[in-house]
């Protein structure tokens, strides 16, 4: 059965590739601006549910569709994708030397199974090097990530301690997804 990743995220695509999961990547448009909540957990859940509803429109093809959404929370204040370099700098200032949470809601839908998971990756950060912040902002890489958090490069050397579920921090609960895929295969074979 074909697996479709309903996301344009290169980090999510890389996670699937690293785990040997074959997939096709397709963008699903869901208007996150229509969500009025400022609660990080509620927001990421509703955004993922919205994407899941869009995915249901593609299900006629007898395929498995995976969607996800992530936000960052610092002191329970939500950080989505920064809209400007100034906002990115504000996000990084708030994260500097503090604990961050990356909340990721991952979901899978197939003709016989629907799975949804909300997980949290926590990291305590050291203080950022101001010259590295400037380089990071100039690179533009921050534009791709919720809260400008890039655990795969910029944030990595600043992690003092963290929870074990790095894939959640990178935007997709791969461990949970693998379990759901195995369950889906068992159900399909019945």
From Swiss-Prot:
Pfam families: Maf. This is Nucleoside triphosphate pyrophosphatase. Transmembrane segments: none annotated. Belongs to the Maf family. Its cofactor is a divalent metal cation. It comes from the Bacteria. One of its GO terms (molecular function) is nucleoside triphosphate diphosphatase activity. Keywords: Cytoplasm, Hydrolase, Nucleotide metabolism. Coiled coil: none annotated. The active site is at 69 (proton acceptor). It comes from Helicobacter pylori (strain P12). It is found in: Cytoplasm. GO terms for biological process: nucleotide metabolic process. GO terms for cellular component: cytoplasm. Its EC number is 3.6.1.9. Its main location: cytoplasm. Nucleoside triphosphate pyrophosphatase. May have a dual role in cell division arrest and in preventing the incorporation of modified nucleotides into cellular nucleic acids.
């Amino acid at each position: 059965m074909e697996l479709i990743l309903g996301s344009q995220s290169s980090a999510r695509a890389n996670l699937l590739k690293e785990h040997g999961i074959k997939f096709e990547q397709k963008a699903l448009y869901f208007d996150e601006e229509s969500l009025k909540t400022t609660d990080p957990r509620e927001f990421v859940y509703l955004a993922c549910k919205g994407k899941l509803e869009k995915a249901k429109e593609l299900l006629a093809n007898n395929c498995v569709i995976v969607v996800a959404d992530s936000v960052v929370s610092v002191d329970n204040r939500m950080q989505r994708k920064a809209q400007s370099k100034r906002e990115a700098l504000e996000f990084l200032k708030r994260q500097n030397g503090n604990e961050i949470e990356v909340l990721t809601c991952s979901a899978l839908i197939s003709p016989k199974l629907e799975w949804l998971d909300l997980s949290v990756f926590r990291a305590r950060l050291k203080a950022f090097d101001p010259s590295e912040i400037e380089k990071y902002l100039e690179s533009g890489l921050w534009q791709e990530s919720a809260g400008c958090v890039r655990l795969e490069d910029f944030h990595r050397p600043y992690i003092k301690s963290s929870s074990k579920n790095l894939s959640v921090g990178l935007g997709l609960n791969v461990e949970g997804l693998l379990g759901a895929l195995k369950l889906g295969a068992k159900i399909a074979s019945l």
